[in-house]
From Swiss-Prot:
GO function terms (MF aspect): metal ion binding; oxidoreductase activity, acting on NAD(P)H, heme protein as acceptor
Domain of life per record: Bacteria
Assembly and interaction partners: Interacts with CtaB.
Cell location: Cell membrane
Topology in membrane: Multi-pass membrane protein
GO biological process: heme A biosynthetic process
Binding site for heme: 260, 321
InterPro entries for the chain: COX15/CtaA_fam (IPR003780), HemeA_Synthase_type2 (IPR023754)
Its job: Catalyzes the conversion of heme O to heme A by two successive hydroxylations of the methyl group at C8. The first hydroxylation forms heme I, the second hydroxylation results in an unstable dihydroxymethyl group, which spontaneously dehydrates, resulting in the formyl group of heme A.
Name under which the protein is recorded: Heme A synthase
Pathway(s) where this gene product acts: Porphyrin-containing compound metabolism; heme A biosynthesis; heme A from heme O: step 1/1
Gene assigned in the entry: ctaA
Species this protein is from: Flavobacterium johnsoniae (strain ATCC 17061 / DSM 2064 / JCM 8514 / BCRC 14874 / CCUG 350202 / NBRC 14942 / NCIMB 11054 / UW101) (Cytophaga johnsonae)
Pfam families attached to this UniProt entry: COX15-CtaA
Catalytic activities: Fe(II)-heme o + 2 A + H2O = Fe(II)-heme a + 2 AH2
Length: 341
């Protein structure tokens, strides 16, 4: 690491921490059914929550016009105090998004003015800023889907929002790693790099399906392992909830859960393959540490997934499972970087 890059690295890693925090709060927002509490979006006027009783009541009255209240919460003795709870989590999620925007943009302008960024890093940072702006759009695009008729957001949009947050985090970490390890890696092992790429692709597919499971509440059924309900590996409901096999596998609760729980074995398998294949090569310390950490994390994540399913997605386990996915992606990004650069 070059000394002149230290402040830029700290900036990028701070962004990673904030992105991690935002996904954690996003997970709490989803698991507490708070995501539809703010029914519009304003860049400036939503910066702070309502500060008077009258403004709180006005926000609550506006919320009552939308499907989540009219079809669900109206039957649950839902009071203003309940509304304040769900409002807080959605507001906090958006507030962190605004902080992230400032943390990325203001120092970027400063580093540009001080000429602390080379041309390559400038281009990467511009991509990061664009990704952040697009992520904000995806968040509102997701929320809008739950404000029309169905009081649930589209699981496709939720998964897109979630997965793109993971990708933005991974790319931010990658840019930071480029500065932490500016020297070219003379121990670049192409076979391992290619396997790591497949592992990353498998992990991203699993994250996408994790979003599907979350959006459809598919973790609340077939709460058994290693088999589904009735002691079946593939329960009959996997094939009958939707009109076609493809629809069952991307829209049916049972089908989506089946893919997510089964594909977990594939993720574990490809990472184990990377681990055992790496034993045939002489690795650097960072390469070895990355692969070893990856193996530990994938087994922890697998077990968390099993227990989250068995206990029907309690808030704590569901959140820890999502957090562990972040750590797993971090280890995957680090490992691939050390095998590639």
């Amino acid at each position: 690491m070059k000394k002149e890059n230290k402040s830029v690295i700290i900036w990028l890693l701070s962004g990673c921490v904030l992105l991690f925090l935002m996904v954690v709060v996003g997970g709490i927002t989803r698991l507490t059914n708070s995501g539809l509490s703010m029914t519009d979006w304003h860049l400036v006027t939503d910066t702070f929550p309502p500060l008077t009783d009258a403004k709180w009541q006005a926000a609550f009255d506006e919320y009552k016009k939308f499907p989540e209240y009219q079809k669900i919460n109206i039957h649950n003795d839902f009071q203003l105090s309940d509304y304040k709870f769900i409002y807080f989590w959605e507001w906090f999620h958006r507030f962190i998004g605004r902080i992230i925007g400032l943390v990325f943009f203001v120092p970027f302008v400063y580093f540009l003015a001080k000429k602390k960024l080379d041309t390559s890093t400038i281009k990467k940072c511009i991509v990061l800023l664009a990704m952040g702006a697009f992520q904000g759009f995806l968040g509102w695009f997701m929320v809008r889907s739950g404000l029309i008729d169905n009081p649930d957001v589209s699981h496709f949009r939720l998964s897109l929002h979630l997965t793109f947050a993971f990708i933005t985090f991974a790319y931010t970490l990658w840019v930071a790693l480029d500065l932490i390890y500016p020297e070219r890696n003379i121990n670049k092992i192409l076979p391992l790099r290619n396997i790591a790429r497949y592992a990353l692709a498998a992990l991203l597919i699993q994250i996408i399906y994790g979003g599907f499971v979350a959006g459809l509440n598919a973790g609340l059924i077939h709460n058994h392992w290693p088999l589904m309900s009735d002691g079946e590996f593939i329960h009959e409901s996997v094939f009958i909830e939707q009109s076609s096999l493809i629809k069952n596998l991307i829209e049916g609760k049972s089908g989506v859960q089946f893919v997510h729980r089964t594909f977990a074995y594939a993720v574990v398998a490809v990472i184990l393959f990377l681990f055992f294949k790496s034993k045939k090569y002489t690795l650097t310390r960072t390469q070895s540490n990355g692969i070893n950490t990856l193996v530990v994390f994938v087994f922890i994540q697998f077990l968390l997934g099993v227990f989250t399913l068995l206990y029907s997605v309690p808030l704590a386990l569901g959140l820890i499972h999502q957090i562990m996915a972040f750590f797993l992606l971090s280890a995957m990004t680090y490992t691939l970087h050390r095998l590639s650069k």
